[in-house]
Regions:
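Conserved catalytic motifs of ABC-family nucleotide-binding domains
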Residues: 165
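Conserved ABC ATPase signature
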Residues: 144-151
Length: 184
């Protein structure tokens, strides 16, 4: 809505994520069939199921990466498809299989994501430094992402999802390619 900020649209009493009858077909294949789910703020949920069950498709629709054929997704009460810009400001997404700008260094990539999220340069610099340290990537911050291992790439993608301090964090296959010590 013109003149409104994200804060104006957020419903503090709303769940962190609400999915209402989301559905998606790929041709004749039903990938997701009217799934509904309410995830309260402050909670941690996992979607578990066999390969091809629709977990990634569901998360992609819920976070605005894939348009559903039916249903609705709300982040803190904001409809992902009616107010996509505002909703996406509230969520950090570690998507499975999404390519990164791997010709940037890890530090440059995190800074890029922070600036895209509308953070000022000083805040981005501080958060970038903190995230590199937290994820044990300080020494790799000046290395091109293309030269990272699969596990390091996953960690730098997580840093990009966290840089703007989102209200909701959605992780798809977060431990794939990550060493057991980092996963713990």
């Amino acid at each position: 809505m013109p003149g409104q900020t994200v804060s104006d649209l957020v419903d503090a009493a709303a769940p962190a994520l609400e999915i209402r009858a989301l559905g998606k077909r790929f041709g004749a294949k039903v990938a997701v069939d009217a799934i509904s789910l309410v995830i309260p703020t402050g909670s941690c949920y996992g979607l578990v199921g066999p390969n091809g069950a629709g977990k990634t498709t569901t998360l992609s629709m819920a976070t605005g990466l894939l348009r559903p054929d039916a249903g609705q997704a709300l982040i803190s009460g904001i409809d992902v498809w009616q107010h996509p810009t505002e909703a996406k400001q509230l969520v950090g997404v570690l998507a499975d299989g999404v390519k990164l700008f791997d010709r940037l260094t890890g530090e440059q990539l995190i800074r890029y994501h922070g600036l895209l999220a509308g953070l000022d340069a000083d805040t981005v610099a501080s958060r970038c430094s903190d995230l590199l340290a937290m994820l044990d990537l300080t020494g790799a911050g000046t290395t091109l992402v293309v030269d990272y291992s699969a596990g390091m790439t996953k960690k730098i993608a997580l840093a990009c999802a966290l840089v703007h301090a989102p209200r909701l964090l959605v992780l798809d296959e977060p431990f794939e390619s990550v060493d057991p010590v980092s996963a713990a």
